[in-house]
Amino acid sequence: GALRNLTSRQFQGYGQLEWLFKESSRERWSAFAGISGNRNDSFLKGKSFSSTGPGGWNQTGYARIGANYGANQGRFSWNASVYGLQGMPSFSSDLQLEELGATGIKPGESRALGGSLNLNWFVNSTVQLSLGGSGQVAFNELTGDMGFTLGSDTGLKGLPGTYISGDSGYLWTTELTWTFWTNRKMALQLSPFLGAGRVSSQRSQGNFSDTVGSGAILLRWLANRNWNLELGWISPFEVEERPYWEDWLLGSGVYTKLQYRF
């Protein structure tokens, strides 16, 4: 269909300042403030198209402020974060603001509060249990870059970060990691994963909500504290609005991830 000829390109920049209030061997307190800018270019059959700006591009931005807390005690460690989002209309042109307003989105009134909590339990020297939860509540309609997403590295494994998102939402994850082989430079881990979440949005055209979850079994290879290679099997569940997700190889099938840390 026509959607096969539709492509997009995204550019995003984010700058942040962090203030460290307290740091010791057991806990850490900090606050942060940052600004994000996002630009989306749309193409149909290789040609730019959009009614919201010249050249087929849309641009938005927002400010983010919040605080972080982390601690560890014995075999447990945890960290928590709270933040607030405020849309910045100065990133968009007058025409783009007019088009956004037609869908009920006013960047100057786009606001949200969110937070996350993660807990790690080191059962013994080879087994670790990780639990995580996060959520966001929007007080008005948000621009796309301010939304809460269920995918990407911080969410459900195997789910693209932009696949399911909404103004408000929540997410929970649990992962058990067993390091069954290690030497001075490398380690092999086996890790079952389970997670699920829900997002919702309100627009002038109507309301939207979606729920999705995924389970996985992963084999992870770590080397020299730089390389991280994951290979496993992913299976989705609790798919509501987009049941065809379960038929995709990307949604139910082989999952790979390669990461290098500098």
Language model features by range: what are they?
Residues 22-24, 124, 224:
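Residue-level recognition of beta-strand termini and adjacent short loop/turns
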Residues 208-229, 237:
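C-terminal structured "cap/appendage" subdomains that terminate the fold
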Residues 7, 57, 209-211, 248:
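A generic structural micro-feature
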Residues 41-188, 192-202, 239-249, 256-261:
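C-terminal outer-membrane beta-barrel translocator/porin domains of Gram-negative envelope proteins
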Residues 219-221, 226-227, 233, 248-262:
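Outer-membrane beta-barrel "beta-signal"
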